[in-house]
């Protein structure tokens, strides 16, 4: 089927912001303006449009959308129609995993900032993530109508706090209650939006006299930023020639795509001003799928063989599943981004990560207020597939004939666990199914059964993360659950290198005996080992096994059993039963018996040799250390810092927020000391402080803590 929108006119972008910048209102306004400009149902010729809204209302549920498709022809309808796939990004830093996964599939971003609060701590976290993925972005300074709004202060903070070269494309006309509109620095005209039509209509006017000089200065700065795109433009500009509007836009686009500049827009989403012009900026300055580097991946059979796919309908099909949403009626909705090729409903594809085939049943396109079943998706599209069985977040779905594994998303290991049980025994099975579904949606959440106690253990990224999981059990699956006290995910390791351990497992009293003899050397796993091209591929679960046997003193067929014995032993360490990490084991010698040696005998020998060697290698217990950021009014700073120290925290420094109203305290605090911190901080600061926390690293626990944990274990 022919494309209705050329791929060059696609914009896959996210709205990024910290929690108070007005992201929701901005997103709503985007859907409002774009929804009005296009009659849904004409997207794919003859495709059935199925409005699910009534059914949703009857059921009292909302199928949340991870990506919404909309269309935009420009504020004054002068641009060719562009297709927007707007990817949802959460504002809460406790769910950095969510931000990461949306950044993985978007090509550009609109960064929403509050004109009053400016660049806040959470903005910095999200900005750093976007830098890591080299995401081109434009900034929208929202809430220009609020008391204390200051566009110029935010511009300066973008430079001072985030190191960004901010290039205003507009200046505000007035601020706070007097915010009337913006000056368009490209056209050198004032824009006023009509309030009666909720900003659907607007008119150009003259720039107010008191802004003329400021506008000239800002335009010069913008043109200079454009001229730096290439020598030809710079010569033209320095020679006194006027640059055409198209030249300026193309040059600014080049520099935005290279993440050299951040063009700035402003407005008030709440007052229906500015969002429309910012959407024109999305078209003019953010990338299409063909403007970003080809997606990279590896060969299915050889992870060292790099491959790539062009954003082209004719290329082999490749896509990435980036979010799974469980809906009680439709089942699992798998959102995926198509990087290359095309896919039709009913096709069978390969999940190259799992090595399993999946049949694509229905494909749904999400719009602002309805869902549409579509026949096919093309390169650059984002859609949802219904009913995939084996696909989880981060998996690649691709053509069976020309498979590829796209670059995986990295998901952090959980750092906190708690036991959970249903309040009524009859809910046991229901709870198991519900937890399984939630784990499929969220790769940073894990579920397992404790073999000794039989309890169900859930693990996640923090207390808040698990609280929300328990809340969702109740809200979405009607399972009331009791939870145990949170448990810290400690680890065990060794500190001495080259520790030899010799163990002989021999039972030879009549009949067929058992005989396995191994000599191993234990050492801490080093950064050099991880960087070694030969060793690195063999490191799994932070453990490296090296076979140094020569001359056949142990036959080859027993080596896998020896490794298996070691790997099974490290899942529950000798100190307190926690997983063993960062250990290298070399198999250096041993012996065997022609008749009595068996795989089981060598497995037992390697397990016992490891336990004995581990005890001699100065073992230590490792505890997770969290990076904590606390924002508190200055009056409480002393109390908060004192409490951080009592929790064995190490202060990393402090700062003040953009508007100077609060202190930002950065610290490294052991997770074991952070339970109940939300409540403690609330009572210390009368509910006026907030904090965010993410896992940073493991380090040895002090002796008193280690002893207490080992006693419990």
From Swiss-Prot:
Q: What is this protein's name? A: Elongation factor G
Disulphide bonds in the chain: none
Q: Which SUPFAM superfamilies match?
A: EF-G C-terminal domain-like, P-loop containing nucleoside triphosphate hydrolases, Ribosomal protein S5 domain 2-like, Translation proteins
Q: Which residues form the tr-type G domain?
A: 8-290
The similarity annotation says: Belongs to the TRAFAC class translation factor GTPase superfamily. Classic translation factor GTPase family. EF-G/EF-2 subfamily.
Q: Which GO terms describe its cellular component?
A: cytoplasm
Q: Which gene encodes it?
A: fusA
Molecular function (GO) terms for this protein are: GTP binding; GTPase activity; guanosine tetraphosphate binding; translation elongation factor activity
